[in-house]
C-alpha cells in the first residue's frame, strides 16, 4: 500500500547539481523505485538551491529511511557528500 510522505532535504553549499545528477541517474532511479513510484513524485527546490522537497508515494518506508540515513550502500557515498540534513513527514488528507 502506498503512503503519502514529504521529504525535506537541506543540501550542502553548491551540491544541488551533484544531488540531482544522482537522483536522475540509472543508479539513483533504481534505488528510488525500491522506495516509491518516481512517476508520482512531486519535487520542488528553493530558489537558492539549498533545499529540496519531495512529495512521494512510498511503498517501502524502511528503504526510504535507509536511502537517507546512510545505511543504503548505493546512496551513502553521494548523500555523505551532498546532504546536510533531512526530515520525513507522513501526510494525511484533511477534508474540508
Go through each PLM region and give its residues.
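Short S/T/G/P-rich N-terminal loop/turn motif that feeds into the first structured element of a domain
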Residues: 1-76, 80-96
